[in-house]
Amino acid sequence: MNNSFNKEDRMSSDTMVGSCDRQTKNGAKWHGGVSSLLDFTLIYIQLSTSFQNAGHSFKKQHICSDFEVMDELSCAVYGNKFYYLLPTLTHPSIQ
């Protein structure tokens, strides 16, 4: 499992707080952008082709469990783009 989270220096007009690249145990790769939005964090994940074909419920469960946030998030999948919104303070990668 290869996990990385890179915080970026932010200009006052920039809401981007970092990006994530991960390869899961089954070899699926994804990249995510992390943006602050008021008191919430919007996670945008670009799924690999193999992950796209795995099915909505698997993708949602697998990615959410990888981020170790379960209850306080809303998930949405549109094509190969996966989004979820959660309170910023509960996100383990940007505390």
Swiss-Prot record:
Residues 1-12 have a biased composition (Basic and acidic residues). Residues 1-20 are annotated as: Disordered. One of its GO terms (biological process) is innate immune response. It comes from the Eukaryota. Transmembrane segments: none annotated. Keywords: Immunity, Innate immunity. Could play a role in innate immunity against viruses. This is Putative protein RDUR.
